[in-house]
């Protein structure tokens, strides 16, 4: 399995989500960003297993992110998706916050990212899904 191959344990609610939907683009995709310069962001895509587009595949993303950040504060983050600006939506797999959903502000891409770029969005993947809403169209 993906977990045994990568020697990680995923939260049960996220594992069940993967088995039921295998990622994808949610209709209700907007979430609040507390403490960020933007009020909200969106889920452009949740990655899946064996996705035909390599850049939307969990294993490809897991391999890409291995060692991506110099700061060890990022070591326990597992990227599950991205927003419209390619910011990272992750699960925290650490003992302290296991299963929490994390937003990493990747703007600008070329800077060294630190703890200041991390925003805890929800305590669990289920709580994150429950807070998603459909954004109103801006005219």
Give the role of each language-model region:
Residues 1-87, 135-139:
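A surface-exposed partner-binding patch
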Residues 35, 44, 102, 121-122:
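N-terminal non-cleavable signal-anchor helices
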Residues 88-93:
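Short, surface-exposed beta-strand/loop micro-motifs that present aromatic residues
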Residues 97-110:
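Intrinsically disordered, low-complexity regulatory segments enriched in Ser/Thr/Pro
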Residues 107-133:
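Compact, glycine/acidic-enriched structural inserts
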């Amino acid at each position: 399995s993906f977990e045994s191959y990568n020697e990680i344990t995923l939260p049960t609610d996220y594992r069940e989500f993967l088995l039921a939907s295998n990622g994808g683009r949610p209709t209700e995709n907007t979430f609040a960003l507390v403490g960020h310069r933007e009020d909200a962001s969106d889920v452009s895509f949740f990655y899946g297993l064996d996705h035909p587009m390599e850049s939307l595949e969990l294993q490809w993303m897991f391999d890409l992110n291995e060692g991506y950040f110099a700061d060890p504060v990022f070591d326990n983050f597992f990227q599950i998706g991205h927003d419209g600006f390619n910011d990272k939506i992750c699960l925290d797999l650490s003992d302290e916050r296991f299963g929490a959903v994390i937003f990493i502000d990747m703007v600008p891409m070329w800077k060294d990212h630190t703890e200041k770029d991390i925003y805890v969005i929800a305590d669990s993947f289920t709580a994150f899904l429950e807070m998603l809403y459909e954004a109103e169209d801006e005219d």
